[in-house]
A protein has these predicted regions:
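Flexible, membrane-associating and regulatory peripheral segments of lipid-active enzymes
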Residues: 1-116, 123-133, 142-154, 177-179, ...
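Active-site nucleophile loop of the alpha/beta-hydrolase fold
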Residues: 183-193, 213-218, 237
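Tubulin/FtsZ superfamily GTPase core signature
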Residues: 171-173, 181-184, 222
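Catalytic His-Asp charge-relay segment
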Residues: 210-214, 231
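The conserved beta1-alpha1 loop
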Residues: 87-89, 162, 188
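Alpha/beta-hydrolase active-site loop signature
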Residues: 121-123, 191
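Glycine-rich nucleophile elbow surrounding the catalytic serine of serine-hydrolase chemistry
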Residues: 160-172
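Alpha/beta-hydrolase fold nucleophile elbow
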Residues: 151-163
Length: 339
């Protein structure tokens, strides 16, 4: 039986040259990559899409081609504004809820350039295949980053990835050639098949000058261990997140990360989290008296693990007071009513 399965595995695999790796100088060892037959026609330079959205085109994205600078010049790209790059996760597309909600929040609140990465031709496959070959998407993101760096400052570019998209961002950070990425935000980075990987091939704090992470479905769909400089754990960072009902596999909790992040864009004073060693200490008020914002308006350069509670539904911020003792008391009181 084992021999039969191995034979099927060999039949299902074929060597496909991924030209983008050796042609551009990006990527990893070897110029051949073993790909399943389902991906033999997948070409990253053709099948990974970059759509630009701005205040002038909020609903219809303009496709950007890193190899064609004119595609940027004829768009509504504002060279004086920041750039937010959004990378979706498994079984999603560029038009899924994550991309739409976060993109709309950025444009309406901050008026920035938003580039949505759409890699659905790979992300719709079985999870193990999407996971094994997401490095091809990461190389394309790295090429996009280096292309943009010719026209905007390094500090102007911020990459946000959800689920597998967070690891795509991290791998891109390993191979960029025009300076280290300034900031990467991981929204509940995927855990399955990745939690055993040490550093390379997943998101970690070496992939950008500053990496912040929001964990909401650790030990299930998400990665629980710290991955960045600053790791935030709303409601312990595990399922079931408040308001998610049964949530057997953690899907609702997995999505909660980008809903919290989307809300953080609108208010720079929300989602204050307490630096703490672990959740048990947080609940018992045995933490450092150090509070920091979670989300878009995070204080750059902070390090550590941070814990907070959120409400069952939007608005998720619990709105506690500024006094430290009152904060902890209010957090506990409000959470007991909502969880």
């Amino acid at each position: 039986m084992a021999a039969l399965l191995f034979a099927f595995y060999l039949f299902d695999m074929t060597y496909v040259k991924v030209k983008v790796y050796h042609k551009t100088g990006y990527g990893f060892k070897g110029k051949f990559k073993r790909l399943p037959r389902a991906l033999r026609n997948f070409k990253p330079e053709r099948d990974v899409y970059f759509y630009l959205f701005t205040e002038h085109n909020t609903h219809q994205g303009h496709r950007i081609y890193p190899e064609k600078p004119s595609s940027l010049f004829i768009s509504h790209f504002d060279f004086n504004k920041d750039v937010k790059i959004l990378i979706h996760g498994w079984k999603n597309t560029g038009n899924s809820t994550f991309g739409r909600t976060v993109k709309d929040a950025y444009i309406s609140q901050m008026g920035v350039n938003v580039i949505v990465v759409d890699w659905h031709k790979l992300s719709i496959l079985a999870y193990h295949r999407s996971c094994r070959h997401m490095d091809m998407v990461a190389v394309r993101v790295a090429i996009l980053y280096d292309f943009l760096r010719q026209y905007v400052a390094r500090r102007a570019i911020h990459i946000i990835g959800h689920s597998l998209g967070a690891h795509v961002a991290g791998i891109a950070g390993e191979v960029v050639q025009r300076g280290k990425i300034y900031r990467i935000t991981g929204l509940d980075p995927a855990g399955p098949m990745i939690s055993k990987i040490r550093t390379h091939g997943r998101l970690d704090k070496e992939d950008a000058e500053f990496v912040d992470v929001i964990h909401t479905s650790g030990f299930m769909l998400g990665f629980y261990s710290p991955l960045g400089h600053a790791d935030f754990y709303p409601n312990k960072g595990t399922p079931i997140q408040p308001g998610c009902g049964v949530d057997v596999v953690g899907r609702c909790s997995h999505r909660r990360s980008y809903h919290l992040f989307q809300e953080s864009i609108f208010n720079s004073s929300e989602f204050m989290a307490l630096q703490c060693q672990n959740w048990k200490h947080f609940v018992k008020n045995k933490c450092f008296p150090t509070w920091h914002r979670m989300g878009e308006h995070i204080q750059y350069g902070i390090e550590g693990k941070f814990f907070l509670r959120t409400a069952r539904k939007s608005p998720f911020d619990v709105g506690y007071t500024t006094d430290l003792k009152s904060r902890v008391h209010n957090l506990t009181t409000i959470s007991n009513k909502t969880v």
